[in-house]
Amino acid sequence: MTGVQTCALPICSLHEDQTRIQLGLNRNEFVLFYQPQVNLKSGEVVGAEALIRWQHPERGLVAPNDFLPLIEHHPLSVDLGEWVLNSALAQMTEWRRQGVLIPVSVNINSLHLRQLDFVERLEAILSLYPSIPNGQIELEIVETSSLENLEIVSETIDACRQLGVICSLDDFGTGYSSLSYLRRLPVEKLISILSFSTGSRRR
């Protein structure tokens, strides 16, 4: 034995990827795009969904499916989630200055939601943007991330509602415990990408 420490390639690669994502966050390489939500009858824009992309200096614009799974269970996902919240609220504040007031939804994973200080930190972030009225920011909880201890999650969602934040379940119908979530979590909206009857994708 030479005493040189090595590690399995997949583990090394994952660590390197996570380090690069952290560097990207520090360098402001992430951007938000806003997908409009339109009333089909009136054609009016009634909201927007904030979609994160990574403006990588070598790889170009990287889709979230290519980097978010790498940090789904890593504390870095909490940092990125807070960046998304701050960026979306800052954009909403700018739109409001221009006379545009529309609700915006952002995705949040279960690790972020289950942080013990989540509500406290959310309240602190909201306080930085006092011009945004209650009910204008929505948290789309990604159901495919493991939601543990539904009682605590339910209490957190209730606390968010007290702050004027709407909560919804994203990807509803993709997990084995979907109906349990529906019964036990006080969310205000369900966002389903699957049909219960046919199993066909909506998007």
Predicted regions and their residues:
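Short, small-residue-biased leader/transition segments that mark boundaries at the very start
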Residues: 2-9
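Signal-transducing alpha-helical linker
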Residues: 12-16, 20, 26, 72, ...
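Active-site core of bacterial EAL-family cyclic-dinucleotide phosphodiesterase domains
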Residues: 13-70, 107, 169
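Anion (oxyanion) recognition and catalysis
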Residues: 26, 96, 161
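Residue-level detector of anion-binding/catalytic polar loops
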Residues: 31, 101, 166
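Catalytic core of bacterial c-di-GMP phosphodiesterases, primarily the EAL and HD-GYP domains
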Residues: 42-49, 75-152
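The catalytic core of metal-dependent phosphodiesterases that act on cyclic dinucleotides
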Residues: 125-200
